[in-house]
């Protein structure tokens, strides 16, 4: 409950006792007349007591004589007799103050002791029975809780003499036990000053719960005397501490020694006792005092200077010197959406919050105090929530002490943006500090704290200071951004508010900019950024990320979430932009490519147009113009710059940036260029030749031999290059290298791969390493040979090692260096472990070489101990007799006749547990129910989970996960985790229905879900009872036989409410009769039954759903996963069947065409669904096609089977040479949907992109005979559309447009591992025949080539296609026609990119001699006529005097009004961080009338036309956009 409400309640209850220093007592009546002689009970306390939770009170009971029969009762139950409590009474809650007053005038007589007590009316004093005057049995109630409320009775035996008290405990709103850590003790001072016993609890708060304390009964003098003790007779004030603790100002009287009188408003101060006592206690601990005399002065436009004085020292802290200070500062946001000139009126006073009472409020008179209490705006803790709505955006401002949070919520997308304004701090040991990187013309709150070894002081007095206004030093630095905005077609209304960078926008303009003009930012941002990158400054000023696009001049649109930062950060953005004009250079100008080779580029540029004198260096960014290529960054470049190491015949894009000491420019115009192709064939059969620094190929001869590892091709000619060795080995010795390196003659015999290095040649180890290694990287082999880490530099660059330390590794070096020269097998690749069971696992790998005689398979334990070594002649092996739930690792080594190759990398796996039954999982939580419901918050609870499903007790902590879902507005479950058996769901939508269930988790084992309840988020709305499902007969194993008669009963506890009960089991649904609390279904078990679901609901829509799973002993059945499996040559195939049914250990086998299948191997796995059997065939051939049967034989001899057809195809080529991407382009697919067609690009999800308008085209281009239905199933393609994924027949009536992108993506994936493309196509023509040759990398993978050709310039002619497995082919063509030719490589995985070439027609056609001279004459005549005509047209075009019909078709290259097209620089923004833009469809020249058609060919949505009048600012056109003349 909120303290404010409690304060009003408490004030009402105590109104009769306030206003003066007198109190009125209610007498406590007895049921008998009090005589002067008989025993009777008396009290000074009232009969009705209202006391405060957490404090103590007393119930006085005094007997006018002595008796052992005085008994205390609570609510009729006895709790004590005499001065002793009963055993059932908690002494922590009660205490009896027992005292006896002896009447010595009557004297003493007789003797007494423990065994001989005195009689009634007497008390044993010094072993004598003395007459009693009175005996007190006062009951003290300690640490009051609500359980102590009730009726108390003090009674004399069983007589009618009694006292009754009614005790009412009020909620205090204070945290329990808050007083326990308060250490001060003013008990002696309080006793000396005569403070009332009812008030002495505040003199020593640590015992406040032990003694009677009633702050409402304390008088003015009590508080005066107590505060005199707490403030050392008024010499110390605690008011400042109370301010920092946010104690209301009308309670400051209790923080100083200047207490005047008790007022009605002081009643509210009860709820601030923890803060007040903490401040009183803090003064006597060695904390430092806060710094004083805080002075804050503005420096420049973005700094504040803060200075202070050292805090005063006291007796308590003089032994603890100040260690350092912390300066805290926070921006006071000016939020225009709230209206007003100053925006949000925050924290205008010292430590005050929105709505807090001002300091002078607590000084008013008694009559006015009541009005203060009634004012709803001055709650004890202040009003901390402010909500408002503007332009459809809800804004909520939440403040808690020193942090302010502004939240905007978009009702359309149901999303929020949060902005927090919290204090930042700077630590220092000085008494002055300068705060930098602040916002100009902005108010800040500043305070300082001091720290010593004991702790930190309270904050000092807060200061509010403003930074200075930012003034531009040089107006010449401001660009003409208004003209730029006008040229960019920004509306004049928005341009006047956004493009004038010389001044910050006003509050009213800010609201317009954030709402009406927000759509103009893509045009305005590049204009005001002016080629500079202001992002670093904006980040320092705390600009929110949604508005950082403005700082970088981005053309991205700002979403609705930017409304918040536009209102809060716009002034800081304009401040950074103005600073950048003075300190940041613009981008380099006139970037040009001056020289190109196959492997290098020369780039030149000029100085920036702005702030060129500030430039310190330039940075070059270059990358291939392909998706996903890495960016090469070259710093400190100087114009002209030569960049080497580029790939030949490749397209690149580069850009430059300028850097100054204070910032950087935006990227320059992106330059697109292509390196030259290599012009000197032949290329190396493997790898690339050696190139010189200038990009030219290195020429080798006898004088300039190739280095080790390379051979000189074409020796004796001018086309001799250094190419890598093509395979097996180059030599068995390296003596020539040793001679060149001046190896001593005594060590020359070691320069062979079958020799090692002797000890006498240790000092020549590095020479031997460099020659033997041939400069190749042998690190993998060295790691396998376990070469020590310091000595691994012999296996890679720089090929030098310390001789003394690494000489012992020579034998390992020799093994690795000689491996490349002995034709040993390569390391086995792609080792995979599959079909893992509790005692077996299958190991498979790639068989890449044909000369392997055997594979060695080694199995290791987790610690590395070798367990088994097996040999396999195939590329697969299965280990059996393994231990369950154990870690293993395996590696494979290939062996041929020359020896064994290096071992593969280890593959690790873990066998499955011996028992796959899920009995080790905890049971599902039960009795999920509502504890309380307040509407937006609901507390749900459940019974704890203590056992697992196998009845074992859980041994580890249980973590519960609660799931809840808004049934009307959400499809996403929200989760909460807890280790308790309850949780509070917060921020629920009022009056909404929610589904709720809970699961339990022990380690990584999760239970099934509990029953599902429906909660109505409505105050005091209880949940529905949980239904109970009982199934008879109750089989312990939970397994029922088909046809067995079962009875399923769903019932509810006895409640007085009509509820609907629906019991669903398979296809059976039964409902309860009106008023009945149960429903029964009697039926026979069948295979359709797997779950019994009982749902209880009421008229409000709430539900409680319970489920119970049924397991049926199914009839034996076997099904194939696919009826038809299409497989291509050299692929692998997996035929999968699933067996369900009774019986143990069924025998499963596969047959092919009626006979036992011989090629392949079987993988068998047992699951909850049954047995899954897979017949795996690697590298399928033609003879493997046919019908396969999965045959299952049970223990009783019954046999079931299912069949599937394997269809073999070698046709993997398309009908024309166009690839998928080309097909999509031809079909007109554009935008993001085109990415689905591109191999290597991230495929788009149909959930994120709407490509249904291209569905027909996508499905057409995705047509493929390959079977990729597994991928389609995983991508969510429905079964009716799966034929499109396997090349089967398909009904045109079925709509599969929603799956078009997924089907295309799967088709693309099947091509990603296709063969690489051919290279170096060579064409030789002779007498009507053309011989075509090409190069292809050496590989042992199966492949063939397809050659397409047709006549050039005839798009209507069909392509001719030929296939071959050789790297050449001969074509019959017409020698008088030009032909275009395309060649690709293909295998089972797909085909490569097409390599195009051309066949020119015969340049010397055979014609008759009689016609030759005549033809030549007419050719000359025609050429002369055309020459004269062309010259005339050229002259007229220069004079602009061409007739309209002719001029229309002649482009004027120098026309300044010629339309240009701008496209986005891919390198813009963060270097290379922008999205790529593909440019296709550039047409010829066009007039204004055809401009729209030309622009429609562009695929980017952000294209902008270059202004025809912006001739004076063309340099700025190169920042974000490049320009193409069309």
From Swiss-Prot:
Biased composition (Low complexity): 24-33
Primary location group: membrane
Localization in the cell: Cell membrane
Signal peptide: 1-19
WR1 domain: residues covered: 682-724
Xref: InterPro entries: Cys_repeat_1, DB, FN3_dom, FN3_sf, Ig-like_dom, Ig-like_dom_sf, Ig-like_fold, Ig_sub
Residue spans, topological domain Extracellular: 20-1415
TM annotation in the entry: 1416-1436
Keywords from the named record: Cell membrane, Disulfide bond, Glycoprotein, Immunoglobulin domain, Membrane, Repeat, Signal, Transmembrane, Transmembrane helix
Cysteine disulfide partners in this protein: 61-154, 1137-1190
Ranges of residues in domain Fibronectin type-III: 379-470, 587-678, 827-914, 924-1020, 1314-1406
Glycosylation sites: 87, 143, 158, 181, 414, 427, 475, 489, 533, 590, 617, 662, 754, 871, 906, 939, 979, 1004, 1049, 1250
Gene Ontology BP annotations: sarcomere organization
Cited CDD domains: FN3
Gene Ontology CC annotation, any one: plasma membrane
Membrane topology of the entry: Single-pass type I membrane protein
Region (Disordered): 20-39, 1485-1518
Pfam families for this protein: DB, fn3, ig
Parts of the chain on the Cytoplasmic side: 1437-1526
Alphabetized PANTHER family for the sequence: FIBRONECTIN TYPE-III DOMAIN-CONTAINING PROTEIN, TITIN
UniProt name for this protein: Ig-like and fibronectin type-III domain-containing protein 2
